[in-house]
Amino acid sequence: NDALVGSFDIPLVENEGDTLKIVFNSEKTIGFIEKAQVLFYENNYAIKQEYVDLANKLMDNTALMTIFRLSLTDSLRDMEADYMILPCPKYDEAQQNYCGFTHNGFSVFCIPVTCATPDIAAATLEALCAESYRTCTLAYYETTIKGKLARDTDTAEMLDLIHEGVRFDFGYVYSASLADLIQIPRNYINNGKTSKGASTLAKKVELSEKKLPVLLEAFENLQ
């Protein structure tokens, strides 16, 4: 469900002057929740299970498709049936491009306060990350994913399409500090078809709005 927020081009946080504003309480978010509830609870072709179980069903040929992170391709290497990788769907025909958020599970470095030369340590880490982006990431994407795991040229083309639409949303990246903002639609959908997205979305977002100034102040104190 979280992936569809990105593919449907639903912003969580946007710039407003010299600050940020949560814009997740929108008609589009409500529309997404309502459509997802229809998909999961008014038809018999959607399976609501844990990610790992859905991946196993795909590999066992008991599911036609699943939404998953690109890391799943490592597990699909030994899958007997052919498979394709496709971008997540658009919200509607009016949406111009395929897009998606990066996941909010990032690796980070921490420099201890006992470090005698924090500026040098930070510069070194930044240089290593930059070089990794230029070499390791490229090798993984072009050589491993496209060259070894993709089973046809169409999949390689789809990967480029997905890569071109990747973007960051502050509200997703820092969701854990914003009362789990990205998880609001997921929780509604998991609660069943009786869940009313429009009636309680504002209350949930209001809690995130209270957390945002605290997070921004923490960033300002780093300067």
Which sequence ranges carry the predicted segments?
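Glycine-centered hinge/linker elements that transmit conformational signals in sensory
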Residues: D2-G6, I10-E50
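Paired acidic/hydrophobic, glycine-rich loop segments that form the ligand-binding mouth/hinge
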Residues: L64-R69, M84
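Extracytoplasmic/periplasmic substrate-recognition and gating elements
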Residues: R77-T143, G147
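Extended alpha-helical or coil "stalk/linker/tether" regions that are enriched in polar/charged
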Residues: K28-G31, R77-A81, C88, G100-T102, ...
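Structured segments of extracytoplasmic/periplasmic soluble domains
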Residues: K35-N43, N61, A127-T135
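Extracytoplasmic/secreted envelope proteins and their assembly/folding machinery
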Residues: I33, Q37, A55, A121-L125, ...
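Conserved C-terminal helix/tail region of periplasmic/extracytoplasmic solute-binding proteins
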Residues: V113-A122, A130-Q223
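Short helices/loops that flank or line small-molecule/ion binding pockets
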Residues: Y51-T66, D74
